[in-house]
Structures are given as structure tokens and as C-alpha cells.
Curated annotation (Swiss-Prot):
One of its GO terms (biological process) is translation. This is Small ribosomal subunit protein uS8. One of its GO terms (molecular function) is rRNA binding. Signal peptide: none annotated. InterPro entries: Ribosomal_uS8, Ribosomal_uS8_CS, Ribosomal_uS8_sf. It comes from Methanosarcina barkeri (strain Fusaro / DSM 804).
Length: 130
């Protein structure tokens, strides 16, 4: 079986584990992109600690959940956003203003839309979380 979108799979694993009340979950396969998204989610306070575990294959992430994720998901296709168009995408993917976050990949790395707006840079949408 071929895994077409590892990021979407990782985010749905987190969402499902939160929905049934688990305190941790395992994400496999691991990638740098998934690790960067997890780091942004951790900085925003949606997940606790996470660690990379080398299993001899692609590796796995062990994620500690804190019960703050209501919904999260990958955004497909990866829409390009400019510095002035964040509000349009916030209205489309987030339930209310200043509630939740869009995760964006930029030339300066993966960050939330708040950080990208502060630095005045655009990029491509990866995911949303609230």
C-alpha cells in the first residue's frame, strides 16, 4: 500500500487520538516536513512534547497530546499565499478570527500565519489547526 500524503495521515492520527481521549500517539512514517509542522503546533501549544524514534526504516514520532486540538488537517492543493491574503484563507479554513492557526511553508522555514505576517513573507499553505 502506498501512502500518498504522509502529512495528512499524521494530522488525522493526531485528530483521531485527541477525539478518543488518548494522551499520546505514534506517527509513522516520520519526515522533516512532519517534524517541522509538529514543532509549530508545539510552539502554539496544541501538542506537548514529541520525539523522533529511529526504527531502522523511516522512523516514527511519539507525540504527547494535551487535549487542545479540536480539528486539524492538511490543505490540498498547497495554495500560495501572499502577505496580504492571509485573511481570505483564515476565513476559509478557521472557524473564527484569532482562533486556530494556519501552518505555512516559506523560504524561511515552516511557521504559523502569525509569524509569517509579522515577518511580512508569504508562502504555501500546509495545514490548519484549531
Amino acid at each position: 500500500m502506498v501512502l500518498l500524503d504522509p502529512l495528512a495521515n499524521a494530522l488525522s492520527t493526531i485528530k483521531n487520538a485527541e477525539a478518543i481521549g488518548k494522551s499520546s500517539c505514534i506517527i509513522r512514517p516520520a519526515s522533516k516536513n512532519i517534524g517541522n509542522v509538529l514543532k509549530v503546533m508545539q510552539d502554539l501549544g496544541y501538542i506537548g512534547e514529541f520525539e523522533f524514534i529511529d526504527d531502522g526504516k523511516a522512523g516514527i514520532y511519539s507525540v504527547t497530546l494535551v487535549g487542545r486540538v479540536n480539528k486539524c488537517g492538511a490543505i490540498k492543493p498547497r495554495y500560495s499565499v501572499g502577505t496580504g491574503s492571509f485573511e481570505r484563507w483564515e476565513k476559509q479554513f478557521l472557524p473564527a478570527k484569532n482562533f486556530g492557526a494556519l501552518i505555512i511553508t516559506t523560504s524561511s522555514g515552516v511557521m504559523s500565519q502569525y509569524e509569517a505576517r509579522e515577518k511580512k513573507i508569504g508562502g504555501q499553505l500546509l495545514a490548519y489547526v484549531y
